[in-house]
Amino acid sequence: MPLEPEKHEEILNMLLDPELPQSERTEALQQLRVNYGSFVSEYNDLTKSHEKLAAEKDDLIVSNSKLFRQIGLTDKQEEDHKKADVSETITIEDLEGK
């Protein structure tokens, strides 16, 4: 887990001290190096996760679109079928009127 921004800033400010002993300077630089490594690792993991989720989202959008089109076609076919049933119905009034 990368350092908190405040902790990172604290280490950088500590390194500005010209009287800082070499051992503490080395330790601070090592902390920054480790922090950078963990930051890059976490960034790469999050990038891969984001790419995977974006691809899944795109697949879901396509699937959803297909389902809506299929439902739309089914509903239209049902409406057409109902209209056809109604138009084929002959009543006694229709026969008497002709």
UniProtKB/Swiss-Prot annotation:
Pfam families: Scaffolding_pro. SUPFAM superfamilies: Head morphogenesis protein gp7. It comes from the Viruses. Keywords: Coiled coil, Late protein, Viral capsid assembly, Viral release from host cell. Residues 40-62 form a coiled coil. Residues 77-98 are annotated as: Disordered. Residues 77-86 have a biased composition (Basic and acidic residues). Transmembrane segments: none annotated. Scaffolding protein involved in the icosahedric procapsid assembly. Coassembles with the capsid proteins to form the procapsid. The scaffolding protein is found within the capsid as a serie of concentric shells. During DNA packaging, the scaffolding protein molecules are released from the procapsid. Belongs to the phi29likevirus scaffolding protein family. Homodimer. Interacts non-specifically with DNA; probably binds DNA in the early stages of DNA packaging. This is Capsid assembly scaffolding protein. It comes from Bacillus phage PZA. The gene is 7.
